[in-house]
Swiss-Prot record:
It comes from Halobacterium salinarum (strain ATCC 700922 / JCM 11081 / NRC-1) (Halobacterium halobium). This is Protein VNG_0358C. InterPro entries: DUF5789. The lineage of its organism: Archaea, Methanobacteriati, Methanobacteriota, Stenosarchaea group, Halobacteria.
Length: 93
């Protein structure tokens, strides 16, 4: 069964508010194949700007605060990076 009634309507309405700089860490993690050494993450995605509560930061700078040398899974990577970034709202431009 399909929903033919809402073909032209967007699934989620996007607001017209300020933009958020940087990529979500989940998007960066989805581009990688796990398991990976931290140095490989830096080599492949280190120059990527990610969203943090302190504003946009390069991923390699965030990873300097992560002590894990090897990430077995995507979940482990995201957990450790989020712990290094801190929690809170992400500022908009």
């Amino acid at each position: 069964m399909s929903d033919d009634n809402d073909e032209d309507a967007p699934a989620v309405e996007l607001g017209e508010g300020a933009r958020v700089a940087g990529a979500p860490i989940a998007r960066v993690a989805s581009r990688l194949t796990w398991a990976l050494q931290k140095s490989e993450v830096v080599r492949k995605e280190g120059d990527t700007v990610v969203r943090t509560p302190d504003g946009p930061r390069d991923l390699d700078a965030v990873l300097e605060d992560v002590s894990t040398p090897y990430f077995e899974t995507r979940r482990e990577f995201e957990r450790d990076v989020r712990a290094a970034m801190g929690a809170g709202p992400v500022p908009t431009e």
